[in-house]
Amino acid sequence: MKESPKRILLKLSGEALGENGRLFDQDMILRVGRILSDVAATGAQLGVVIGAGNIWRGRQSKEMDAVTADHMGMLGTVINCLCMRDAVERTGGHAVVFSAIDMPRVCEPYNVQSARQAMSEGKVVFFAGGSGNPFFTTDTAVVLRAAEMQADMLLLAKNVDGVYTADPNKDPNAQLIPDISYAEALERRLRVGEDVVEQTGGDAAAGLLV
């Protein structure tokens, strides 16, 4: 029997925290928090990178300085991570936020050894601030943190329910593909965690679930 992954890195869309046009939906937030708490209670070590799509997206910033726009997105991830830390703790779990942008009165400054230790203690570890640098997406950040945490598996929780022939948010004719290998997705040029593949040369494929 294949052994379950012990250390998991999850990329969670910020849009998952809001519904019906709201930035934050408390019922959804608590639901996600309970799921994360339950996963940690099984003994799995869980780290989470959250996007900021419910607060700020790069496509809103075409007329802004790109660095400023990216810094706004990074700060949005801090807000989302603080929100989810609270949700995990309200549902019986233990959590900590490490930020790549120093703000010690709000969350812990990111340190590889401290984050690994927190995961080994059974805390849900939230990685805020992206990679700490502009011009890199949170998909890139989760690959970086997965490598640093020596994760066994990388999960991408996108704002769609699977892999489609095209972006279902843009193309009403997009069709869900119920079963596809990562290699086939790449061959067909489907957009499945494309930043992950670009940053790892495809090495993430074996341990990547979307």
Per-range role (PLM):
Residues M1-Q45:
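N-terminal glycine-/serine-/threonine-rich phosphate-binding loop
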Residues A40-A41, L82-G92, L144-D152, T200-A206:
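Alpha-helix C-terminal capping segments
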Residues Q113-T165:
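Internal active-site segments that recognize and position negatively charged phosphoryl groups
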Residues D25-L30, Y110-Q113, T138-V143, G193-D195:
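Charged helix-capping and loop-helix junction motifs
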Residues S61-V125, T140:
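Ligand-binding beta-strand-loop-alpha-helix segment within the catalytic cores
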Residues G43-G47, G122-V125:
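Loop/turn-to-beta-strand initiation segments
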Residues L9-S13, I50-G51, F98, F127-G129, ...:
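Short beta-strand segments
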Residues V32-I35, R85, G130-S131, Q175-V210:
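Polyanion-binding loop/helix "lid" in catalytic or ligand-binding cores
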